[in-house]
Design a protein with these regions (language model features):
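Acidic interaction surfaces
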Residues: 1-101
């Protein structure tokens, strides 16, 4: 999938997720769009969000950290829209991630 197609699909997913009649401004979309991922967990891992949070923690404390619960709760801070992409004739599920600000 090329970048232009990804952005078109992401823009449509953003508009659908907002649930508005009026199309979002391009600047608004550009600021909000964080990327397309196979899952929200992949977004968290690719952006080192947990590593940043736990930096400086003792290793023992990290063993008690509930990654799954944190990822589930963190998803509430983002607008996550499910979609499908296609590459080489194969369709697969993706998530588009947007800031909710």
């Amino acid at each position: 999938m090329d970048k232009a197609t990804e952005l078109q699909n992401a823009y449509q997913a953003y508009w659908d997720a907002l649930g508005t009649q009026e199309a979002p401004r391009q600047e608004e979309f550009n600021e909000a769009y964080k990327g397309v991922y196979s899952s929200f967990e992949e977004f968290v891992n690719d952006n080192s969000l947990i590593d940043e949070l736990t930096a400086g923690w003792p290793e023992e404390a990290k063993t008690y950290f509930d990654r799954d619960a944190y990822i589930r709760d963190l998803q509430l801070d983002y607008l996550v829209a499910e979609g499908e992409e296609e590459a080489y004739g194969v369709r697969y599920s993706v998530v588009y991630v947007f800031d909710e600000n």
